[in-house]
Amino acid sequence: MAEEIEKSVPTEESLMEKISEKIHHHDSSSSSESEYEKPDSPSAVKAKIYRMFGREKPVHKVLGGGKPADVFLWRDKKLSGAVLGVATAIWVLFELVEYHLLSLLCHISILALGGLFLWSNAHTLINKTSPQIPEIHVPEEAFLVVASSLRNELNQAFVILRSIALGRDLKKFLMVVVGLWIISVVGNWFNFLTLVYICFVILHTVPMLYEKHEDKVDPLAEKAMKELQKQYVVFDEKVLSKIPIASLKAKAKLG
């Protein structure tokens, strides 16, 4: 019996030692985890850096990703240069040479049909068989997807215009009015095709330059936005607050 008691005592002591070792190991691991968590605070501060338009994604993702974003950001310089060159050639053809779209389509159709007609007849004379020209048709699913997405965008635009027309957001109303006025002024300077070409060139230059210099542009944009907010507060206090919109809304509710 005495031997059994002596054997049980060391086992109990070993169990206590193991438990204490586990506790010390857990404390040390938790302290090490807390030490590792401390250096992460600067990254959290970096995440709060101001970005234009409040974006949280890279410029490539904002542009939709994929091939179009690669073209706009000049990831493939040959492809981007070719697209911009074709757009420039079209603009020069219609604006500087004053070539008309209907004439261009007719001339392209004449050349294409004439070439295919001569090639099919020559192929029949030489090979005694008619050439196989593939059938061209617009797929129904792709057309429906494009039409559905366009319908959704138009409905969303109508909802925004309706909310603005109801007078729910005066700030948004003023922004839309100013934007439409700027577009009307620019429309007097350029025709539609030139305006589209200018927008196309801007899409091929501004995002690429911004991506390269965003660390310099974003602080300047932050200062500009703060200044605009200050000016808007002053304008709101002196002008907008004096417009009796609240009383008109109250009368409308009572009526």
UniProtKB/Swiss-Prot annotation:
**InterPro entries associated with the record:** Reticulon, Reticulon-like
**SS bonds (residue pairs):** none
Q: What is this protein called?
A: Reticulon-like protein B5
**Region called Disordered, residue ranges:** 20-42
Principal location: endoplasmic reticulum
A Pfam entry, by short name: Reticulon
* Membrane topology category: Multi-pass membrane protein
Q: Does the keyword Acetylation apply?
A: yes
Question: Where are the N-acetylalanine modifications?
Answer: 2
